[in-house]
Design a protein with these regions (language model features):
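Polytopic transmembrane helical bundles with strong interfacial aromatic enrichment
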Residues: 1-41, 48-239
Length: 239
């Protein structure tokens, strides 16, 4: 049986991996902005700068972003904070998803075109990379300050008698640690970002936690007896 003590090392590893990957994501985005800015300031270095930026994007920024997102979501799902029970957690998750979409659908394709043409980066590309680094820094502040109140979801659960979410078991937490490590190996082997294990683990953790929380949901409180009602007499004891 899993106890809080046996699961603690895995939870510490998950928090550590989230901090490290988030720091790498922010640093990679800042480095990307610098390289893209260099391609604009010196046309002679444009090809080399955007080439280096693409390698940074594929082998650091994308890997770190995927790991930061997956570990952050697993942390939210498997701890008492919950994913949609506190506004600061929900805000971090929303910002992360927006950044992943922007990186995958906008920034990376443009970067591939720049490498193919050896052309300087447009100003919007530099601004996008800088905005990504700033957004990760803001998320770090949210983790430290934990501003704002509980969400309506948390208030409804509190009204039903659940004041705190129970933590998940060790297997789910351990999966959240091991999946990013496995995907790093896949990325190195394939040469492209491959968050396959992280996507699978997120699906498993999300479904498992939803089922577990549904099973342990507190029963609705019984209606209060009307004023003046006589309580039932106790049943007679057997001889």
């Amino acid at each position: 049986m899993t106890t809080p003590r046996t699961g603690k090392p895995w939870r510490h590893l998950l928090v550590w991996l989230h901090v490290v990957s988030s720091t790498a994501w922010m640093s990679g985005a800042a480095g990307l902005a610098i390289l893209l800015g260099l391609s604009r300031s010196d046309p002679a270095l444009a090809g080399a700068a955007v080439g280096a930026a693409r390698h940074l994007d594929v082998f650091l920024l994308a890997v770190a972003a995927n790991a930061s997102a997956s570990t952050g979501l697993v942390l939210a799902w498997t701890t008492s904070w919950g994913l949609v029970h506190h506004w600061w957690v929900a805000a971090k998750a929303a910002i992360t998803l927006v950044q992943l979409y922007a990186g995958i659908a906008i920034l990376s394709p443009v970067l591939d075109e720049l490498v193919a043409g050896g052309t300087p980066a447009p100003a919007a590309q530099v601004a996008g990379a800088a905005a990504m680094a700033s957004a990760v820094a803001f998320q770090a502040w949210l983790s430290v300050a934990k501003p704002w109140s509980r969400t309506p979801v948390a208030r409804r659960e509190r009204a039903r008698g659940r004041t705190k979410l129970p933590p998940a078991g060790t297997p789910l937490v351990a999966a959240g640690v091991l999946a990013p490590v496995g995907d790093v190996a896949l990325t190195v082997a394939l040469g492209v970002p491959a968050p396959l294990l992280e996507v699978v683990v997120l699906g498993v953790v999300g479904v498992a936690r939803r089922r577990a929380l549904t099973r342990t949901a507190p029963a609705a409180a019984a209606p209060a007896a009307p004023a003046g009602a006589v309580p039932p007499a106790p049943a007679p004891r057997g001889s």
